[in-house]
């Protein structure tokens, strides 16, 4: 039995939720997000809460209910506060800048890397070695951050590369002669 699914999602002021069968649409001050819930999950909406439960005849129904509850909670937080992911670049000559809907990266390759941002994701560069991604969809923000990090992930000897701001890179000792 899922402890996560037992807790209802409380809707804050200014958030509208529409349930249409298994489809959930959350609308708030920062935008609108939609999700199709798994068939094993029963969704019920009271005044300002949404509760989740299992449907009979499905294995792992409580697990699916917990997953859907977490996704809906992330949607509610996303349309009210939004999500932020911060990346830092470490290395000589590693730079980033934002031009419109593109993040331009200089990462030591023979060519600059241009990463197109999907809709709903905004990027800022407070400095040449920092990228701040913001948006309403937590999954999309995390995926964009992972894609940018994958261009040049931190190497284990000097730690050069693109890393998350809170990431700690374990460095190895160089080979001794």
UniProtKB/Swiss-Prot annotation:
UniProt GO BP: cytoplasmic translation
Family that this chain belongs to: Belongs to the universal ribosomal protein uL6 family.
Domain of life per record: Bacteria
PROSITE patterns assigned: RIBOSOMAL_L6_1
Disulfide bonds: none
Organism: Photobacterium profundum (strain SS9)
Record protein name field: Large ribosomal subunit protein uL6
Keyword terms: Ribonucleoprotein, Ribosomal protein, RNA-binding, rRNA-binding
Keyword Magnesium listed: no
UniProt xrefs under HAMAP family: Ribosomal_uL6_B
SUPFAM superfamilies to which the protein is assigned, alphabetical: Ribosomal protein L6
InterPro entries, A to Z: Ribosomal_uL6-like (IPR000702), Ribosomal_uL6-like_a/b-dom_sf (IPR036789), Ribosomal_uL6_a/b-dom (IPR020040), Ribosomal_uL6_bac-type (IPR019906), Ribosomal_uL6_CS (IPR002358)
Coiled-coil parts of chain: none
Record carries keyword Ubl conjugation: no
GO molecular function, one term: structural constituent of ribosome
Single GO cellular component term: cytosolic large ribosomal subunit
Pfam family, one: Ribosomal_L6
């Amino acid at each position: 039995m899922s402890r996560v699914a037992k807790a209802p999602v409380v809707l804050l002021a200014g958030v509208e939720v529409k349930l249409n069968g298994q489809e959930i649409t959350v609308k708030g001050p920062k935008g609108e997000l939609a999700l199709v819930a798994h068939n094993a999950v029963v969704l019920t909406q009271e005044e300002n809460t949404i509760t989740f439960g299992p449907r009979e005849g499905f294995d792992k129904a409580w697990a699916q209910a917990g997953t859907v509850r977490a996704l809906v909670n992330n949607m509610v937080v996303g349309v009210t506060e939004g999500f932020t992911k911060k990346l830092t670049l470490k290395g000589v000559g590693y730079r980033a800048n934002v031009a419109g809907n593109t993040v331009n990266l200089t990462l030591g390759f023979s060519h600059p890397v241009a990463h197109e941002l999907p809709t709903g994701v905004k990027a800022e560069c407070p400095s040449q070695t920092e990228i701040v991604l913001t948006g309403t969809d937590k999954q999309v923000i995390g995926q964009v951050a992972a894609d940018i990090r994958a261009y040049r992930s931190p190497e284990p000897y000097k730690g050069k590369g693109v890393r998350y701001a809170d990431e700690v890179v374990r460095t190895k000792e160089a080979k001794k002669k």
